[in-house]
Amino acid sequence: MWPVRRCYVHPVSGLQIFGVPGLPEIVEDTDLAASIVAAATEAGLALADGDIVVVTSKIVSKAEGRTIELADVEPSAFAIEWSATWDKDPSVIEVVLREARRIVRQSGPVLITETHHGFVCANSGVDQSSSGAHGRLVLLPTDPDASARRLRADLAALGIDAAVIISDTFGRAWREGQTDIAIGIAGMHPIRSYIGEFDPHGHEFKVQAVCLADELAGAAELVKGNISRVPVGVIRGYAWEIDDTATIAPVLREPSRDLFR
């Protein structure tokens, strides 16, 4: 299911994680690759081959024009009725519903939805924070994998061979607090399988598979943040599995294997 692939081993001793400060305000058609490279270089943190570049989905969406003005939204009858019950903005709820494949759970004012990508999250990933203007919503990228591939290709055109992860902040069903996870990936396989390998005592792993993409997204969040205006993190010194056809699809559990769906 998860084939072993060749690895990119960066010639650095130890693992380094750093944020990229100084990025400009991202607007539609901003050249993200050029902006990231310029900001990193200006900060004395020039990108290098083998880096893993973790980019907050919000700036990807803004660069791709995935924003919507609330004034342009006409709420449906359901959105109006639901919003009146829970004191919510009906235009926001309408956008949440449009971005959803289905409502997974509804409890009080909380909507947990499955997006058209297959992600299960609050409010379809729709967000007002750091949108760039009052009354504007930022949506998830239409195809985060395609976004990651474009950014990886654009970085390669600038002479940098890096893997790219598009991240977003999600809640977790059984734990308090949010964490960043990967919603798009390019250049590296998202999962490291230990199936068929053996532990130090000779026991064979039958099901062990680690979601590296989520772990790396979470690690990069330690140096990123909305308040600090650092939407890009770089991980250096990690040996990653090269896969130019990688997508986030292997991370999404099929309904037939999901005990809680």
Feature map (PLM): residue ranges:
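Short, conserved active-site loops that position catalytic residues or coordinate cofactors/metal ions
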Residues: 50-51, 55-58, 63
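N-terminal glycine-/serine-/threonine-rich phosphate-binding loop
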Residues: 10-52
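A structural signal for small-residue-enriched, beta-sheet-centric alpha/beta enzyme cores
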Residues: 13-24, 57, 67-73, 78-139, ...
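Phosphate-interacting basic helix/loop segments used at nucleotide- and nucleic-acid interfaces
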Residues: 30-45, 142-162
